[in-house]
Amino acid sequence: MSVLGRRGAGLAARGATLAPLATASYLIRPFSALNRPPPKYPGHVPLTFFERGALAVGSAVGSLMNPRRADLIAALGEATATPYFIYRLRDAMLSDPTGRRILRDRPRITSETLKLPYLRTLPENSVGRTYATWLDREGVSPDTRNSVKYIDDEECAYVMQRYRECHDFYHAVTGLPTFVEGELALKAFEFLNTLIPMTGLSIFAFVRLKPAERERFFSLHLPWAVRSGLASKELINVYWEEILEKDVDELRKELGIERPPDLREIRKLMRQQQKREKERLQGKS
């Protein structure tokens, strides 16, 4: 056999040996960045197990460093919601008549769908007016919520989107503000109500609170979150768009939500007390 013939035979044998290895490698790694399955809905980004883990760790660290990074908090929520927790929330909706209607209708919460100018004309203690007043006071908009993209199941992606867009209603009904102390209190409440891991992980941001804020969180608002979170009905099954004219006190009673201590008023009183104490000390000097 010629040299070229022997070389060709060797290459053929090597190819036969490597073929099973290549097949095994393909089975171990279902897809790569260059061979990714098509998205299952607009904006969907499929992730491998390791990519999802890296996203969870990176977004957790980043959001702890800067709790105002809504994009990182959103990514953390999606990366840690599967495979179990978002399905549990979806099943909670499927087991409830109103939840099933929400899944069928798939409403979206935006400034257009809610008609904010109309909400501002509703009675002062109505759900819609309370919501609009809270948005105006906090300077936020329902149009700023990130779209879900890292959850594979299309229906579960909507469930996460619904939770995300209802978050400001939870703020409005409880009266909790958007600064870190208020967000932590609401996240603790949401964790016990929804079991979404991100809401529980967010509580670790208490390390960024000042000593007085930390003491207040653990003595006042965390106990409130535990009581209300365990006692309240599944908030994901509230069809907010249909109860905008309802009395907010009546709604809290129906849902089993206790009104938390007014955080803004507490901070205001503490500032006044500190000011008086400072003036008293200056008067002595």
Swiss-Prot record:
Enzyme class: lyase
Transit peptide: 1-31
Record field: transmembrane: none
Residues at which Zn(2+) binds: 167-168, 171, 183
Self-association state and partner proteins as the record states: Component of a multi-subunit COQ enzyme complex, composed of at least coq3, coq4, coq5, coq6, coq7 and coq9.
Pathway terms, separated by semicolons: Cofactor biosynthesis; ubiquinone biosynthesis
A GO biological process held by the record: ubiquinone biosynthetic process
Mode of membrane association: Peripheral membrane protein
Entry EC no(s): 4.1.1.130
Main location as per UniProt: mitochondrion
Entry's localization field: Mitochondrion inner membrane
Catalytic activity: a 4-hydroxy-3-methoxy-5-(all-trans-polyprenyl)benzoate + H(+) = a 2-methoxy-6-(all-trans-polyprenyl)phenol + CO2
Cofactor(s) the protein requires to work: Zn(2+)
Keyword entries, A-Z: Lyase, Membrane, Metal-binding, Mitochondrion, Mitochondrion inner membrane, Transit peptide, Ubiquinone biosynthesis, Zinc
Family that this chain belongs to: Belongs to the COQ4 family.
Protein task: Lyase that catalyzes the C1-decarboxylation of 4-hydroxy-3-methoxy-5-(all-trans-polyprenyl)benzoic acid into 2-methoxy-6-(all-trans-polyprenyl)phenol during ubiquinone biosynthesis.
A cellular-component GO term for this protein: mitochondrion
Species assigned in the record: Aspergillus fumigatus (strain ATCC MYA-4609 / CBS 101355 / FGSC A1100 / Af293) (Neosartorya fumigata)
Name of the protein in question: Ubiquinone biosynthesis protein coq4, mitochondrial
A Pfam family matched in the record: Coq4
